[in-house]
Amino acid sequence: MAKEFGRPQRVAQEMQKEIAIILQREIKDPRLGMMTTVSGVEMSRDLAYAKVYVTFLNDKDEDAVKAGIKALQEASGFIRTLLGKAMRLRIVPELTFFYDNSLVEGMRMSNLVTNVVKHDEERRVNPDDSKED
């Protein structure tokens, strides 16, 4: 029977949990004043590199997002050290942080659909108003 998840996926899943804990408890950078969430981790096949996707609670300010990503990238060595101790990996992957805007885009798309449905309902209730457009 084939494995459902390979080693890179299992390590990435565990790494996502551990990085979230490290960011919550260990990192005290003021540039990360906003709540940081690890939304995903992608591992290379040889487990040497990891792309860490993060979102921020207050992500309306683009400069704050850039500063947050820069702070995470600067702290990646410290995070790798803690990660190596927590996960007992022989080789801790090189971490690269990316801002994940999929959550924001999903909410934007949901709002657009909601507005279209609401507008459609209003047109059904008042069909005379649509002829004036």
Curated annotation (Swiss-Prot):
From the UniProt record, give one GO term of the biological process aspect. maturation of SSU-rRNA
User: Which InterPro entries does this chain map to?
Assistant: KH_dom-like_a/b (IPR015946), RbfA (IPR000238), RbfA_dom_sf (IPR023799), Ribosome-bd_factorA_CS (IPR020053)
Q: Which UniProt keywords apply?
A: Cytoplasm, Ribosome biogenesis
Q: Where in the cell is it found?
A: Cytoplasm
Q: Which SUPFAM superfamilies match?
A: Ribosome-binding factor A, RbfA
Tell me where it mainly resides: cytoplasm
Please name one Pfam family that this protein belongs to: RBFA
A molecular function (GO) term = ribosomal small subunit binding
One GO cellular component from the entry? Answer: cytosol
The record describes the protein's role as: One of several proteins that assist in the late maturation steps of the functional core of the 30S ribosomal subunit. Associates with free 30S ribosomal subunits (but not with 30S subunits that are part of 70S ribosomes or polysomes). Required for efficient processing of 16S rRNA. May interact with the 5'-terminal helix region of 16S rRNA.
Assembly and interactions? Monomer. Binds 30S ribosomal subunits, but not 50S ribosomal subunits or 70S ribosomes.
- HAMAP family per record: RbfA
By sequence similarity, the record places it as follows: Belongs to the RbfA family.
Name of the protein in its database record:
Ribosome-binding factor A
The UniProt gene name for this protein comes to rbfA
